[in-house]
Amino acid sequence: MTDAGLVAHLRSVRELDDALEVVVDVGNDSDRTLHYVAEVRAIDYDPATRRLRLRLSDRGRQLVIEAAMVEPTFRTVEPHSEASLVLSLPRTIVRLAPQAERSPEPRFEEHRIADATEVEVEIGWSRTPYYADVRARAEPPEAWEDGTAHASLTVRPE
């Protein structure tokens, strides 16, 4: 019996007319079904290095408003098999701009993530299905994860 975790391979990144498409192949070499987060939970982009990091995991994710917690979409990959996951992202993102001094008005900055030259993907996974715990003081969703699969790809500028 093998008890390996989820394995990820970033197959392709390409810019479409209205989106950035990222295709990830996930594999399961274990003897039981694995469950994984199947949607992007956070996008980190560094315009200076053109590094894009997609997190399909809630580990380390800082929520501004606890009520904003939305449960992710989950998928499964059967024992000794593979599956493909297609992620469709906007070509640009808008985020709060860092400010040297406090200001009552927030500033925003737009970044074109389709210009990324390095793409990394993290996928949270578990050996057990996720069930929401409605009890008070329940474990946070990221406690469900047994591990995180990582994949990266260097993208050649066109």
Over which residues does each language-model region extend?
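Surface-exposed edge beta-strand/loop patches
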Residues: T73-E158
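The feature marks short-to-medium sequence segments in extracytoplasmic or secretory-pathway proteins
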Residues: T33-E82
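Short polar catalytic/cofactor-binding loops
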Residues: R14-E15, N28
